[in-house]
Design a protein with these regions (language model features):
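Acidic, surface-exposed loops and disordered segments
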Residues: 4-245
Length: 245
């Protein structure tokens, strides 16, 4: 699957196929979502887990990814690395797996964030995790030609997280006072996207014809961050088939 096919089409409809929410619901969830690292010692309810599994199954079908929910498995976050990352109580996580390709990281970011927002709507908390966890053999399935990119911790947070510092809209886009409202709203939502170490190394350029070019900067997980940013931008702007390359 090429980059244009992966992110450039109308994949915003995926999230509507999962649950009956409207754009305003998802904009609200974007504002409510904050990264959480400390979780209650409490299993996912069967009802919530079933809804999350259903969301993942639909997104896998749409995206061609092999994302998996891992439940009641605390060993991945019971390590020196996890403690260094200030994680505690994590026993459920989502493994983002897919076939190796140049755009795998971006697709995992884009579709993984859809799952994150759905989890938020189910009363769960999440945190993207790139390095500070341990791979436990046998708990997820990696097919031939596939790779694990990152995981997302998920569960009932001890807190709802907190607002982090953010760059300005002018630092991450070419917006001006005369930019269309949909572009400004998209940039606003993009600034709420979780990025590695809160680096926000992306740039959104409004081009001729109402198209948008999204560029990843240099840094850890920059391509994955770009996929997350695109997900947020589409929801905030209310537009989908807008990307140019």
């Amino acid at each position: 699957m090429g980059k244009r096919d992966a992110i450039g089409k109308k994949h915003h409809g995926v999230i509507h196929a999962v649950r009956e929410r409207n754009d305003m619901d998802y904009r609200k969830l974007i504002g409510e979502r904050h990264s959480v690292r400390a979780y209650e010692d409490r299993p996912l309810s069967d009802d919530v887990a079933a809804k999350l599994e259903d969301c993942i199954a639909k997104i896998n079908m749409e995206s061609g990814l092999h994302i998996q929910l891992i439940r009641d498995e605390p060993k991945a976050f019971d390590s020196a690395l996890a403690h260094y990352g200030h994680f505690s109580g994590v026993s459920n996580y989502i493994a983002l797996i897919g076939r190796k390709s140049p755009d795998l990281d971006e697709r995992c970011g884009y579709f993984g964030e859809k799952i994150v927002l759905e989890a938020q709507g189910l009363g769960l908390n999440t945190c993207w995790v790139a390095l500070t966890y341990k791979r436990i053999p046998g708990v997820f399935r990696i097919g031939e030609g596939e790779k694990l990119t990152v995981v997302i911790a998920v569960g009932y947070g001890k807190t709802q997280g907190s607002v982090r510092r953010s760059k300005s809209a002018e630092e991450v886009s070419n917006c001006t006072d005369s930019s269309p409202e949909w572009f400004l709203e998209g940039v606003k939502a993009a600034l709420l996207a979780p990025t590695a170490t809160n680096q926000q190394k992306f740039f959104l350029q409004l081009c001729d014809g109402g198209k948008v070019r999204a560029k990843a900067g240099f840094g850890p997980c920059a391509k994955m961050d770009l996929g997350i940013v695109k997900c947020h931008f589409e929801i905030g702007s209310g537009k989908t088939d807008i990307w140019c390359y």
